Structure formats: C-alpha cells, structure tokens
Amino acid sequence: MTQEQTPHELTLSGVSKTYGSIAALSDVSLAFEGGQIHALVGENGAGKSTLGKIMLGVETPDTGALTWQGKEARFSTPAQANKLGLVGISQELSLMLDRSVLDNLSIGREKCIGPFVDHGATLKQAQQVMDQYEMKLDPRMMVGALPVADQQRVEILRALNQDANLIVFDEPTARLESTEARKLMLILRNL
C-alpha cells in the first residue's frame, strides 16, 4: 500500500444482524475514514444504533466482517473495541452524576504513585484534555449540577481522555436544545 492508499480506519463488509425474524441490518458495507465526521441518517428502526453497537463490540454481526486500520477485527465485548480506541457515546449519557467532572474524566485513567492516586497529576491530565479541545469546565463541579450540554461535553472529554481513535455517537443532539445542538456540532468539527 502506498502512502496515498492508506486503509480506512473502520470498514464493514456485508454486515447483517437479525433479532428473531426482524432484520436490523442486511448486507451493509461502509468505510469510515480517520479525521472525518460521518453521519448515518435514517428512520427509526433503520439499524443505525445496531450498526454502532456492532462497531463498538456491544453486538456481534450474524454475517460480515469488520476491518480496523487494515486488519480484520472481531469484537465480542466493548472492552476489546475500547482497547483499540473505539468509544461510544449514546443519547443516554453514562456519567456518574454524583461525582465531579474530574472523577468522570479520569475514572480508570488515574495517575498513580505506587498504590496511591496522584491527584495533582490526574487533575493536570484532565486539564490538558480540556485545554487541548477548548472545553473549559470546573473539574470540581458535580456533573449532576451541570446543564445537559455540559454533561455531553464531559462525556466527549472522557472519550478523548481515553485516547479514542474513533467515537461513535448515537443521537448526540437528542437531549439538547437547538442552540446547544449547534454548539455540540461546532465542538465535533473542531476535534
């Protein structure tokens, strides 16, 4: 492969998924390029969420293949997809509302000195991610006290703090007012 022929980040070939007698996906083939925003548009029940779940290892396809960065990939758990940097954000946010922004950003990625969490280094890492993507939030603020748009930012920052290579959003603007939805689209364009 030459430099001009780099592999797509994620390719799905002939992917099908059924639930009983209902075909959620039938022979779907798509390629997603790195550094791009791709949108799947369709009616309710068209299979968009199912496709996202297959990409993230939440569901396994009945037939077809996934290729990640030029190599065949089969995810039987979300953890396997996550190890490769595939992260999902659904319309139902998965935040810990009774914990701080910092706790939500750093869960599982805390900086440690021996068996102890280095709170200063953990805070510094979270601040770096917020600064890098120009999403300023008070790291001490309880997530449950934030407006929905800021909670969505925390969810995005958490994905970015996990070194995400590909982020799959499932209806990211469903819970947002129109002005908040426009702000979210600007954030996504700037990633």
Question: Where do the protein language model's features map onto the residues?
Answer:
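Glycine-rich phosphate-binding loops of nucleotide-dependent enzymes
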Residues: T2-L191
